[in-house]
């Protein structure tokens, strides 16, 4: 078995959020990049992923794209979103994932484990696609309220961030 360290130097970790509500045209669907994160991936002799451990710094989440809003996001909007995510949503607490089981499937693996964020640890399962060149990609849907996170809302609740967001991982494993 070999152990590989991955992080921003080998790929991306992003969070996709979506807006809803009668005033959703005033908000934006966001692509938020996690700038500081690291993961340890254990790979078996056959090249199959055996385990995954990931840690992310909640203060390093930065909005990279805002789609479908009535107007472009301003620098103040971006700063306010960053502050809200770090202080109100995640409480400045580290984000971590530790696999408990990895099961093979066509074109990849299903990873089961424990996701910790905002003071809460819960089971999480997602599929990872693995290409022949070592590219690893997966999306984990997360229902914020299951981690005791209250989705953002404004304008007396007429603009909200949808309760389910997506954590998207896309990395290149080395050919070792």
Task: Report each predicted region and the residues it spans.
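Low-complexity, acidic/polar, glycine-enriched regions of mature
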Residues: 1-176
């Amino acid at each position: 078995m070999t152990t590989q360290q991955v992080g921003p130097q080998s790929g991306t970790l992003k969070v996709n959020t979506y807006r809803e509500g009668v005033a959703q045209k005033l908000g934006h669907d966001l692509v938020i990049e996690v700038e500081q994160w690291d993961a340890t991936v254990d790979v078996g002799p056959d090249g199959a992923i055996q385990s995954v451990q990931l840690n992310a710094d909640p203060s390093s989440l930065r909005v990279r794209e805002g789609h479908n809003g009535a107007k472009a996001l301003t620098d103040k909007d971006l700063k306010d979103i960053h502050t809200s995510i770090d202080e109100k949503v995640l409480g400045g607490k580290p984000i971590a994932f530790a696999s408990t089981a990895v099961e093979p499937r066509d074109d990849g693996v299903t990873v089961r484990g424990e996701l910790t964020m905002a003071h809460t640890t819960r089971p999480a399962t997602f599929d990872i696609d693995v290409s022949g060149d070592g590219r690893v990609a997966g999306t984990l849907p997360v229902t914020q309220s299951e981690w005791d996170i209250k989705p953002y809302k404004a304008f007396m609740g007429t603009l909200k961030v949808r309760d389910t967001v997506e954590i998207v991982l896309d990395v290149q494993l080395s050919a070792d």
